[in-house]
Amino acid sequence: KYLLTRSKCDFCQKPISYLQLVPIFNFIRSQGKSLCCNRQLSKSYIIGELLSYVSLIILNITTLPVNGAVLLLIYFSLLVLALYDIKTFSIPIHIPIIVIITSFILGSFYLLQGCFITMLLHLIFYCCKNCIGYGDILIFALLSFILPFSIFFLILWFTFLTGGCFSIFYIALKRSLKLKLPLVPFIFCAFIMVALFYPFLTWVVI
């Protein structure tokens, strides 16, 4: 029943026509507003639609030793979670559950590695609760189960490298230490960087 449910307007709950579901085209045609009640739509829609096409580039040029279906699964899951994290500073738990089950079915599953890294991540979380959110711990744990260690390590490394650089720049610009950042967008960016430049990054884990 859930899969057959029609998409509805965020505001008036009126069912959306199939033409309105065409990515990018409808957002431009409607000037970023809902056609049924003329209210401004979230910019996350157009951002998500534009970024979804990056997956085609990655799929065609990446040299990651990862199944194409798993690669797309991770990409779109992180994209959705990143946009959700920016808006709410939280993640919907059902998405990681769906991803890990699907990855297991697709044959991309590293049980012992995932268990060890997950325990280590939880230890870090309990020692540094104010430094990282539990949702971020869950995302890293998820990736440790479905990606080879070298790729997981690179994503982890680039996440904190880009997140740290952004934090320093933001603090210097705003002259304030009061900073709360959603981390999943940096995980998403790190995944893209690793997927695109993997052949040039292997020296990091050698």
List each model region and its residues.
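Interfacial loop-to-transmembrane junctions
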Residues: 168-193
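Alpha-helical transmembrane segments of multipass membrane proteins
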Residues: 52-56, 117, 121, 162-166, ...
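Internal alpha-helical transmembrane segments of multi-pass membrane proteins, especially GPCRs
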Residues: 39, 153-157, 185
